[in-house]
Swiss-Prot record:
Native organism taxonomy: Bacteria, Pseudomonadati, Pseudomonadota, Gammaproteobacteria, Lysobacterales
One protein family per Pfam: HGTP_anticodon
Family: Belongs to the class-II aminoacyl-tRNA synthetase family.
Domain of life assignment: Bacteria
HAMAP family per record: His_tRNA_synth
Matching SUPFAM superfamilies: Class II aaRS ABD-related, Class II aaRS and biotin synthetases
Keywords: Aminoacyl-tRNA synthetase, ATP-binding, Cytoplasm, Ligase, Nucleotide-binding, Protein biosynthesis
Species of origin: Xylella fastidiosa (strain M12)
One of the GO BP terms on file: histidyl-tRNA aminoacylation
EC number(s) from the headed UniProt entry: 6.1.1.21
Protein name: Histidine--tRNA ligase
Length: 466
């Protein structure tokens, strides 16, 4: 016998957890669509030369390649050493770049797309790291230009999604890479590659700590003078406490830098100010976002606004949603300039962390809302008719197809997480009613048959707001 098991790095859920996961997906999708984003799906595998155009190094080492057995045999016979023709996608950004470049002549710009699909990475097997996982992305792509106003709207989407998910108080940390790079210029760090390297180190502050990052910036090939490093670390420690405080800190940044401040710094401050102003207009409460000059995002293609979202009471979970603005999404695939802004929610990892922290307990029981008991074989037609009426009334209903002991049927409903159990014996049928047991409240009551579906619907709606 072969031992049944899954490969490491995948998240396989039992039905109750899968229901909770699916409901989170539904909330994310619903809010993406509410803001006018259109669904896109791309193939799970892409041509290797297309997928790997922008990657290299660590990314390429994590890619899963796809090869048919026939192609594999032919390659072995011929001694071919080149990469297989196909590879599984490792994120949704590169497929989006290919998609927009391929269809730019028919797409309407700005193109607002959402994509919720699995991606694959050859991660080292360890707790909390996944080789197959869901990403839930949105992006707004412009042609030649894209207004900074979309950056504010994206933050409003983040707020809408996590408000409805209801997984705890959260906060979006907001920054702009132009502010960071402009400040680095003011400290004498003017080389573009060195700036990117410094930003990657700043992005590691939470994981490595200030002392470790300071030592790295002063030595290890960076060679930045200690005084400038102290200025940089002091600058990135800036946090706002309110909307007004954020605007005041931006004003102070320009005043402190003087009339000769670098253009990039001034541009970044202006963009942040506009985003903050519009976020306020969009109705995002000021406690839901903060200005944080340490947010850099490690990916080099971000050029402006950057976001990171975290749960206030569970900081150990880390970022639950991140993203930012980029200047040219598809420069490897088209000569058109396609700037954009977007975010990604890594739902598989988020769900695993929430479950691990005990935050998913009781979130979902079953997608089945009612079960009809089969009293005996003679009442099968009646049980099926009750179930039919419930389904017509919008109640997800299961029927017991075998006349087992009633106690056994109740045990099944309880174990399956079904809230309502409906039964109709001879007495109930004679009086035109059904008996309903609410397993959640541990109450039993009778309902006229014609009112059964509407009554259960009211009970379910009330449970949503409790």
């Amino acid at each position: 016998m072969i031992k049944p098991r899954t490969p490491p790095g995948v998240l396989e859920l039992l039905p109750r957890e899968q229901i909770a996961f699916q409901r989170m997906l539904d909330v994310i999708r619903r809010n993406y669509e509410r803001f006018g984003f259109l669904p896109v799906e791309t193939p799970v595998f892409e041509l290797s030369d297309v997928l790997l155009t922008k990657s290299g190094g660590e990314t390429e080492r994590q890619v899963y390649f796809v090869q048919s057995t026939g192609t594999l045999a032919n390659a072995a016979e011929s001694g071919a050493t080149r990469l297989p023709e196909l590879a599984l996608r490792f994120d949704l950004t590169v497929p989006l770049a290919r998609y927009v470049a391929e269809y730019e002549h028919v797409l309407a710009f700005p193109f607002r797309r959402y994509q919720i699909q699995r991606v694959y990475r050859g991660e080292r097997a360890q707790r909390g790291r996944f080789r197959e996982f869901y990403q839930c992305d949105i992006d707004v792509i412009g042609k030649q230009t894209l207004s900074i106003r979309y950056d504010a709207e994206v933050l409003a989407v983040i707020h809408a999604v996590f408000s409805e998910l209801g997984i705890g108080d959260f906060q979006v940390q907001l920054n702009n890479r132009k502010v960071l790079r402009g400040f680095l210029e003011s400290q004498g760090v003017r080389d573009g590659e060195l700036q990117l390297a410094v930003l990657r180190e700043v992005d590691k502050l939470d994981k490595r700590g200030v002392l470790d990052v300071r030592d790295t910036l002063i030595g290890q090939g960076f060679g930045i003078p200690a005084a400038q490093v102290e200025n940089i670390l002091t600058f990135v420690a800036t946090r706002s406490t309110s909307h007004a405080d954020a605007l005041a800190r931006l004003d102070a940044l320009i005043e402190d830098s003087g009339p000769g401040s670098h253009d990039m710094l001034r541009q970044g401050v202006a963009e942040l100010r506009e985003v903050l102003t519009l976020v306020n207009v969009l109705g995002v409460p000021e406690h839901a976002y903060r200005l944080n000059f340490s947010i850099a995002r490690g990916l080099d293609y971000y050029t402006g606004t950057v976001y990171e979202t975290s749960l206030i009471n569970h900081p150990q979970i880390g970022s639950i949603c991140s993203g930012g603005r980029y200047e040219n999404l598809a420069n490897h695939y088209t000569q058109s300039k396609l700037p954009g802004v977007g975010i990604s929610i890594g739902l598989t990892r988020l769900f695993w962390q929430l479950r691990d922290a005990g935050l998913m307990d009781g979130i979902a029981e079953s997608s089945v809302q009612a079960m009809v008991v089969l009293m005996d074989e003679a009442t099968l037609d009646d049980a099926l008719d009750i179930a039919r009426c419930l389904r017509i009334g919008g109640i997800n209903t299961e029927v017991q197809m075998e006349a087992k002991k009633v106690s056994k049927q109740f045990q099944y409903a309880s174990r399956a997480g079904i809230r309502f159990v409906v039964l109709a014996g001879d007495d109930e049928r004679a009086r035109g009613v059904v008996a309903v047991k609410d397993l959640t409240r541990e109450q039993q009551f009778e309902i006229p048959r014609e009112e059964l579906a509407s009554t259960l619907q009211v009970e379910l709606e009330q449970a949503k707001v409790m």
